[in-house]
Amino acid sequence: LSREQLGQYTEALADYDNAISIKPDYAEPYFNKSLQMLLHGNFAEGWPLYEWRWKTEQNIGKGLKTSKPLWQGEKNANVFLWAEQGIGDEIMFASIIPELEEQCSNLTVKCDKRLIPLFERSFSKKINFQFDQSKVSEDSYEFHIPIASLPSVLRPSLDNFKQAPRSYLRCDNKKAEKLKQIISTDKTQTLIGISWNSSAKQPCAHHRNID
């Protein structure tokens, strides 16, 4: 990780490979290597390695408890898509929801309660959005998949991302118009709003500043 933070990416990858050769069942170097692969656009190797996140110390036991198999691209199936990580990650990976919905006969999505109005407004009315896990019966789906695993199935290459629609979220037009009226009465001005809150506990949080 020290080499990675210094920008010595080639050396960092070599260190990860060395760690893997010493202890092949240790998840951390696989996961860290996946982040490097994804950062540099090597999705073919990065996404499969990213699945090691579930075996890292911070994620052990956090996955969905179910007897149903992981969805790997099966057509016309009943699929349960469940959220992981933070609300920002849910929004980011949600761009792939329409592609998943095209593959399913029925899709249920568990997400943060705060996102349900946004997602219901932005995506197909056929999708069942839930925030309460207890309301999703295991009998209601054939396969499941965590939201951050979607790219490994549906966007395995950079070209897949380039071909995807650039906008996928729809604002509440009434609230947007009301906010515009509050902010400014000058219709000739362009209004730009930036509002975000994320965990400051993350080691890389200081890199997110836009000062």
Set out the residue ranges of the language-model regions.
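Alpha-helical solenoid repeat scaffolds of the TPR/TPR-like class and their adjacent stem/linker regions
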Residues: L1-D211
